[in-house]
Amino acid sequence: MKKEDVKYDCSFFRGHIPCAPNKDYDAQCDSCTYYEKNSLQIKHLNNSSSLLKEIYEICDFRDSKKSFEPINLSQNFTKILIIKLGAIGDVIRTTPLLEKFKSEYGLCHFSWITHSPEVVPVNEVDLVYKWDNSSVAKVTSSNYDIAINLDKDREACMLLSLIKAQKKFGFLWKDGHINVATKNAEHKLITGFFDHISKQNTKNYLQEIFEICHFDFNGEEYRININKNLSNFWSKKIGKLSNNKVVIGLNTGCGSRWKTRLWPKKYWISLINILQKKNYFCLLMGGADEDEMNRYYRDKTGATYLGTFGLEEFISISNNTDIIVTPVSMMMHIALALKKQLMLFHNIFNIHEFELYNRGVIIEPHSGCDCYFGNVCKREKSCMNDISVQDVLSNIVLLNKNLKNK
C-alpha cells in the first residue's frame, strides 16, 4: 500500500488514524468498496498566511500581531527544531534523537515545541516552547537547518509546512492533507491509517522515528529531567519506609481512556499480598485517575500509597524504586528513562512497538487480544484476566535477579 493510493477525499477518512471500514472490515483504500467521495476532506493551504490561519483556528488561538526576531547563532551550530506535541510519554520517548543528532552533527542548538515542556530535558534542549500562539509565532519567525515533526495532528503537520528549514523530516501538510516530508516517513504514515498493516509491523517506535530522520537506531537512551533535591528527599523517606527492602512501584492504572489495559483488582490485591510476604516493599503509584483505586488497594493490603503528585515529584519518587510494574502508560516511559527494571503489561498494541533496552519483560494474555488499539473490550471477559498473578510473580523474580547482577 502506497500513500498515493490513500483516498484522502473519502468521507470515512479520519486524518491520521484508521477509518471505520478499516477498523471493522480491514478495508484498504486501493480495493475498498466503502469509498464515498467528499471534497470537503481536502484543504489546500498554499501559502504561509493560510497555514498560520488554519493552525490558529484549529487551536482556538488569537493572533497577537506581535513580531519576533529570528534566533541568531554561530554558523558552527546546527539549528534543529523538534515538533512533538503529543502525550507526555510520547515526548519522553522522542528524546533519544537528541543523542543521535549530536553524534551526527556535532554542535547542535535544539528548539522543541510541545504540550508537555516539563519533560523536555532542559540541560540538552536550548529552547523549549509550550504550544500556544506566541510559541508558534516565535518558531515560524526563525530559520532552521533541520525541522522534524513526529506528530500526525493537523496543526503539527501544518506547522512543519510553515517552518523555514533546509531539511524537513516527518509529517507535513501538502496537497490538502497530511503528507510526508521524505519517503522515510511513509511507513509510519501507512501503519497509522490501516490496523491490519500496523499489526504486521516489526519495527519498534524508536527504529521508526530514527528511520524518519534518516538514521539507524543503535540503543540511544531516553533523556529526562530529574530534580536532584526532590529525588534525594524521597530517597531518604522511601528508604525509611521500606527499611531497605527491594522497592516495587506498582502503577495500577493507565489513565481514564484505555480501560482495556487494566489488570483485574483481585489480581492486584493477590499480587501485593504475596509480594509483601516475600519481603518486597510495595509502593502504589498513579495519577489522579488512579487515586481512588490506589486507596482501595492500600486499605485492602496495607501497601504504601503516598498520594498524587505533580509530574516533577512523581518522577523523583519513581527514581527511588527498584522495579516498576505497569501497563503501557506514561509510567513505562518514565521507568525506561530512569533505567529501572520494568515489567510491562501488554495487550491492545503491537508488541514489537516497545524497546525496553534489555531492562524489562513484556507480559501479555496467552489468549491474545481482540481489541487492537481499542478502548472498549470486545469479549465478555477481558483478556487481561488471562495474565495470571503467578506469571507476574515469576517475572518479578527475574527482574530482581537482574538487580543483583548489576
Annotate each PLM feature.
Residues M1-K406:
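Catalytic machinery of carbohydrate-active enzymes
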